[in-house]
A protein has these predicted regions:
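Conserved N-terminal/central alpha/beta ligand/cofactor-binding core
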Residues: 6-93, 134, 143, 158-164
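Conserved small/polar residues in nucleotide/adenosyl-binding loops
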Residues: 176-177
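N-terminal Rossmann-like FAD-binding beta1-loop-alpha1 element of flavoenzymes
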Residues: 1-2
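Glycine-rich loop(s) and the adjacent beta-strand/alpha-helix scaffold that form part
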Residues: 118-173
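Core beta-strand elements of the Rossmann-like FAD/NAD(P) dinucleotide-binding domain
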Residues: 106-115
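Flexible, active-site-proximal loop/turn residues at the rims of small-molecule/cofactor binding pockets
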Residues: 20, 104, 122
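Short beta-strand segments that buttress and anchor functional surface loops
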Residues: 97-102
């Protein structure tokens, strides 16, 4: 059994309708624009279903597909609009509990478990647990990565963005306001 805690109202992170970045993965690793690369597994399953059901590329439809995938898995409990804000440790090396709060229904959650994965994007669980972390992009010399940037090649942190697009589908479409 897993509990998926998401601090936003939709799943997908940067690929959600809130941010609207497309799922790239291997197809654009380090900006190489490899048109022959393709993600496999669950990502491929989601992308194929999105292509089939969402010919216009509406980001809200992708949100729905992601939500359906989670609901189809009986061993996942989903907590949307719920942010982890603190942790408890069983010992100096072991997280035993996370504390979360849902802003939509003012509910506090105390979640116990044996394994926790921080995929929040901001690393709150890892930070509260005292894990080592870094901010920004590491230079090539840090890990001897061939395609990593030299210092100063791009910004150290991601900026904010707003993204609009339009598409002539050749037929009437729903207008979201």
């Amino acid at each position: 059994t897993a509990i998926l805690v998401q601090d936003r109202p939709v799943l997908g992170g940067n690929a959600s309708s809130e941010v609207r970045l497309w799922i790239l993965g291997a197809t654009s690793h380090m900006g190489n624009n490899n048109r022959w690369s393709r993600e496999g597994g669950l990502v491929d399953e989601i992308l194929i279903e999105n292509l089939y059901r969402n010919k216009e590329g509406n980001p809200v439809i992708l949100d729905t597909i992601l939500l359906e995938k989670v609901y189809q898995e009986p061993n996942i409990t989903l907590l949307l609009n719920t942010a982890v804000w603190d942790i408890e440790k069983a010992d100096p090396q072991t997280v035993s509990k996370v504390y979360a709060f849902c802003s939509q229904n003012s509910t506090f959650y105390e979640i116990s478990g044996r394994l926790f994965c921080d995929a929040s994007g901001d690393g709150i669980l890892a930070y509260r647990a005292g894990a080592a972390f870094r901010m920004g992009a590491e230079e090539k010399r840090c890990y001897n990565e061939q395609f990593a940037p030299d210092k100063g090649e791009f910004g150290e942190l991601l900026g904010h963005s707003i993204y609009f697009y339009s598409l002539d589908t050749g037929k009437p479409c729903l207008l979201y306001t």
